Amino acid sequence: MKGQLFVICGPSGAGKTSIIKEVLKRLDNVVFSVSCTTRPKRPHEEDGKDYFFITEEEFLKRVERGEFLEWARVHGHLYGTLRSFVESHINEGKDVVLDIDVQGALSVKKKYSNTVFIYVAPPSYADLRERILKRGTEKEADVLVRLENAKWELMFMDEFDYIVVNENLEDAVEMVVSIVRSERAKVTRNQDKIERFKMEVKGWKKL
């Protein structure tokens, strides 16, 4: 059985990263797709674990070579998902989680219709604004860009399969875990098991 691609999206400050980290701890056979980006590395981030931090020149070369499943310029920086990473893990039967922006999600949706799309939303825009301002990791100009982009991204919630409102982290994590488990139980993902049962039943003689 092939793995499933899960796209988790939402505005900056909605809590996607925190949710994904917890989900990966609680579920087996799930891997996080590490994206490439041209933005500066934050103090707490690790190259190769949180992102692959590369120059814009290197990024554009990879675009020309067709190495990205999707890519977009977000908040003034380039972000891209490596096609080889995603496809190799799905073919191995592992579920892959992407943390990408709305532009990237819509791009993936056009190419991979069987992908599961989850939107992480804040309780309100006012709450989101407060979270971003409290973070204090970016310059004022960058914060303003993120707030404006958040307004735009929130308008696309109805393009997704599931909405998770992150009012409480534990509840939000459990909801995403439940979504993954539900998707794994779908008939379309278990045709091999169904066929085995049918073959077994056919092999039994009548009493």
From Swiss-Prot:
Domain Guanylate kinase-like: 3-181
Compartment annotation: Cytoplasm
Keyword field contains ATP-binding: yes
UniProt cross-references to PROSITE patterns, sorted A to Z: GUANYLATE_KINASE_1 (PS00856), GUANYLATE_KINASE_2 (PS50052)
NCBIfam families associated with the record: guanyl_kin (TIGR03263)
Role summary: Essential for recycling GMP and indirectly, cGMP.
Family: Belongs to the guanylate kinase family.
Protein's UniProt keywords contain Kinase: yes
Protein name: Guanylate kinase
Transmembrane segments: none
Catalytic activity entry: GMP + ATP = GDP + ADP
GO MF annotations, alphabetized: ATP binding; ATP hydrolysis activity; guanylate kinase activity
